[in-house]
Each structure stands twice: as C-alpha cells, then as structure tokens.
C-alpha cells in the first residue's frame, strides 16, 4: 500500500538541514508541511495552483542552496510546461518531489488522469529530467537522500494514497510569511 502524503513530507523534513529551501504547493500540502515543521526557509504556496515548481525553479536559478519543491500530480498536470522548462534549465540544486495520489487533494480528492493513462515519469523523462517513481516510504527516503547528496536536477514521483491530514490553517499572515522567507534566503 502506498504511503500518505504527510509521511512523505515528514521524511523530507527529517532529511533536510537548515540551508535547504522547501517550496510547497497550494492548499493542504502547505498546511501539512507547516504542521510537521514550520521553518523560515519554507515557502508556502497559498494562492496559485500549479506554480510551485516554477517558483522553485526561479529560486534554484538564483541561489546556490538546494531547493526542494513539494508539488502534486494535479498541480503538475495544470502546468506541464514547467517540466519542459526545468529540463531545459536543469539546475543542479533542484529536487522536484511530485506527490502523486491520483487526486486533486485540496479540492475534495477528485481523480486526476495519473490514475489511468497519464504517466508523469515518462513525461518528465521526455523533458530530459532524471526521474524515478517510488511506491513505498522506504524507497522514497532512499531516493530523496540520494538526491540531496547529488549535484544534479532530480524529479522523484512519490505514489501516495489520496488522504488529507487534519491540520489547522497556517496562522501566520501570508505577507509575514513572504517577508520572513525573503529575509531567510537573503542571509545565505
């Protein structure tokens, strides 16, 4: 059985240091990241579905720190062009973790096409990206640790069950989060 998204997020947080930047996609995944561990170097995407991968790319191209993006299959499907751009730019400090639960988790778990005929690994590989799909928590952690220690762009597609952890809303106002994040990455 596939793991839950929150368990993947916990493994990400357990394995990053203080220097890594984490960008999380819209809605519940951002709330889950905040619930697991709020950090100044977390960027919580609160308003634009499909743009976390592009925001992470911009950060990776403009800083030396490792940038980890937590995105969903639904968000990636809304912005497939981001994979092509990431593959073209190919930043060595970029890890894209696609949580593939075959559902639009933040809007009620409506099914996405990845549960049928859309293969995100093949799409990402077609864009020139080093990509692997994991189906267990142990396999994900192994691949994520490897990616953290490599100097190359990596996409990890983590198959998960469609499940939303019950988490409260992020209590810090978005404008405060923005400035806190900007100050944190300026110091690196």
From Swiss-Prot:
<comment type="similarity">
    <text>Belongs to the TPP enzyme family.</text>
</comment>
<dbReference type="InterPro" id="IPR029061">
    <property type="entry name" value="THDP-binding"/>
</dbReference>
<comment type="subunit">
    <text>Heterododecamer composed of 6 subunits alpha and 6 subunits beta.</text>
</comment>
<dbReference type="InterPro" id="IPR051818">
    <property type="entry name" value="TPP_dependent_decarboxylase"/>
</dbReference>
<keyword id="KW-0174">Coenzyme M biosynthesis</keyword>
<dbReference type="GO" id="GO:0050545">
    <property type="term" value="F:sulfopyruvate decarboxylase activity"/>
</dbReference>
<dbReference type="GO" id="GO:0030976">
    <property type="term" value="F:thiamine pyrophosphate binding"/>
</dbReference>
<comment type="function">
    <text>Involved in the biosynthesis of the coenzyme M (2-mercaptoethanesulfonic acid). Catalyzes the decarboxylation of sulfopyruvate to sulfoacetaldehyde.</text>
</comment>
<dbReference type="InterPro" id="IPR022494">
    <property type="entry name" value="Sulfopyruvate_deCO2ase_bsu"/>
</dbReference>
<keyword id="KW-0456">Lyase</keyword>
<dbReference type="InterPro" id="IPR011766">
    <property type="entry name" value="TPP_enzyme_TPP-bd"/>
</dbReference>
<dbReference type="GO" id="GO:0019295">
    <property type="term" value="P:coenzyme M biosynthetic process"/>
</dbReference>
<dbReference type="Pfam" id="PF02775">
    <property type="entry name" value="TPP_enzyme_C"/>
</dbReference>
<keyword id="KW-0210">Decarboxylase</keyword>
<comment type="pathway">
    <text>Cofactor biosynthesis; coenzyme M biosynthesis; sulfoacetaldehyde from phosphoenolpyruvate and sulfite: step 4/4.</text>
</comment>
<keyword id="KW-0786">Thiamine pyrophosphate</keyword>
<protein>
    <recommendedName>
        <fullName>Sulfopyruvate decarboxylase subunit beta</fullName>
        <ecNumber>4.1.1.79</ecNumber>
    </recommendedName>
</protein>
